[in-house]
Amino acid sequence: MPDAVEANPPLRYKVLILGGGFAGAYCAKALGKLLGPKAVDEVALVAERNAMVFHPMLAEVAGSALAPQDVVHPLRQFCRNVDVLQAKVQHIDWQGKKVIVDGGRFTRNQTIHFEHLVVTLGSITDLSRVPGMTEHGMPMKSVTDALRIRSAIINRLEEANLASDEEVRKRLLTFTIVGGGYTGVETAGQILDLVKGAKEFYANLNNTPARVVLIHSRAHLLEEIGPELGDHAQRVLERRGMEIILNSRVNEATSGRITYNQTNSIGTHTIISSIGNAPNPAVMDLCRQLGIEPEKGRIPTLPTMQVAGHPTLWAAGDCAAVPWDDEGEMKTSPPTAQFALRQGTRIGRNIAAVLKGEKAAPFTYRYMGQLATVGTREAVAEVMGYRFSGFIAWWMWRTIYLAKLPGTARKLRVIFDWTFELLFPRDLALPVAATPDPMPSVHFEAGETFIEKGDVCRAYLMVRSGLITATAPGEEDRHYGPGSIIDQAETENGLWKRNLTAVESSDAIIFRGRMLELLKGGVRLVPGAAR
């Protein structure tokens, strides 16, 4: 155990920015530039990670087209003259004008006092609305997520190359993406490129086709840029071999299957989820303190991005509903990167003006359009009211986002990696794996036999919800409900003695690794608890 850490004295700043995404980083950058060197004592940026992720290129990391360091930029180098604090926001106390943050394992919670508060915390990922998705779906929101997806795909290829059972191989070579927005479509396109390019290096996969399946709940992909371009993106992806399922909602996910529209299912061991955005709990708590009604999970603001009745509270980005004059029509700004970075810059300028006794200006932005890649040398675009697709759209996507990528060194690295990709195959080396969860959760659908008699025992289970039955011919069934442990009582010589089947939709915790070795040594967590 580490030595006890004494409580830290509170920190104090004139301006405290919460969130290190586009809005928060560009706000800090603007303030640091306008206030100069003195800003380091007056302005602080609190972020969970010390680097800003350039999300438009994140899918290319998952597809092994770019290295992870190409899409992150250190906040301390980006936000000059600003104090960057790596910590997680625990609580915002608006009445006390303070924020409680968690700095890490060896520090106590830190209190930070402020005069002006800028909330740019964005949204969170919540997959719990689909049974099993939290346990078996991989989100796509961070560099860690992208690397995890890349590792999973390459691991599936390696396992499929070794498998002799054709049905097992088919499940291993089926990659399912849920959600047909920007993240889902761009990630699906990158995975398709990676898998198609990699198969030639796996000698045993020539006769088993890989499947990349995209499931979307709406009638068109990329509804943000209109049905015409969404339909074009669909045609391009289908022409390249992707399966696209529209007007379909996912109902359940397990380690070997995904179910949609209640009765349809796909055998797969790889599920990538681009759905599940949910309001940030800290933002919702702040709204409750202020007595204001969130707008679809976002803080409503004035055009200046101040919260009505609270001139020292500002909000921007995905967690803020910012009014926007779209050529004479008032709308709420969409939660996209191009709006977030401009909102952040405007807040920085507004706060600098208010500190000088001047008035804050409203947020204005002339919408330029949107672009999305759908694979190698293919993209769709809506720019200045014009819609087009193909190579020109792809070239424009790369040119525009390369220009927006922070840091000259990163621009040069991305140019090199893109050039390298045109000439050589994508990298199939497995990145260093993250430390696994010692007790991960797993979900089983009703009727699923997830262990068969004679299988090697690689883990024990504790049932969290549902009902699991252990069966063997000529023997009485055993039933395991919530709180029950399925352990060595069901094994013999390292093999399972019975089939394990989920009678109803069930969740369980897995014990493996050192915990499994301890249990195999004879330690029982609780009596079998079978009934």
What are these regions (language model features)?
Residues 23, 122-125, 188, 277-279:
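Short glycine-rich anion-binding loops that position phosphate/pyrophosphate groups of nucleotides
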Residues 169-225, 229-235, 243-245, 333-372:
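Rossmann-like dinucleotide-binding core of oxidoreductases
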Residues 2-91, 175-176, 185-225:
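Beta1-alpha1 glycine-rich phosphate/pyrophosphate-binding loop at the start
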Residues 4, 135-166, 257, 265-340:
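FAD-site-proximal beta/loop scaffold in flavoenzymes
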Residues 1-3, 10, 339, 346-433, ...:
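C-terminal, flexible cofactor-proximal segment of oxidoreductases
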